[in-house]
């Protein structure tokens, strides 16, 4: 019920308007949601970057004392508070009004984030809307704030998804909404190589097929030029310094 309220009427209207666009019926969102849900609750300090109307603070069973920091634009979080109407979270929820292109790190730490503790970072439905340079700088900032044992969860679309003609109606739709897709890669592991994180990139089709939610053949990654998306789980191993420290 909380999730439906956060979506608002316009959320359902957008979903209806998007029906019939290429690949829109693929079960990407529910499969991604379950994948992240199973991993997020392992942490006692969680940061949602570009949190939007995420309802996990209210619907998941959290460890005692867990803190969930929700980072997003001030106007987004203000609308979220209005729609929540006083609903109580199941954790210590900490809204952090900040722009990810600005000084969000200072805002996060001022709200009580403790970089010496392992964290779970969630970049859900975010990276595809950012330029590649911003994607890399954002990951470097996350690395600098992460203690050993921290986890990062993200979804990444394949490069083919940015240009294939069959997706043009969907690209036109999101562009009109002011949210064009900007970033994709067929090798998401390479984003983390400079950071030294241990990363596993799961093909969405494989994850969905294992869950009985995929109606199409799963195409091996060695076959290029195919539309695909990835669910990424990365962990910062012990003994790793922040990437920024290595450069000094």
Label each residue range with its predicted role.
Residues 120, 146-160:
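Conserved beta-strand signature within the Rossmann-like core of class I S-adenosyl-L-methionine
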Residues 105-115:
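Short amphipathic alpha-helix with an adjacent loop that forms part of the alpha/beta core around
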Residues 103-106, 129-144:
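A short, conserved alpha-helix within the catalytic core of class I
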Residues 212-248:
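Core SAM-dependent methyltransferase catalytic element
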Residues 179-204:
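Short alpha-helix
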Residues 118-134:
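A short SAM/SAH-binding and catalytic strip from SAM-dependent methyltransferases
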Residues 163-178:
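Short, glycine-/aromatic-enriched active-site segment of Class I SAM-dependent methyltransferases
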Residues 1-47, 53-98:
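Rossmann-like AdoMet
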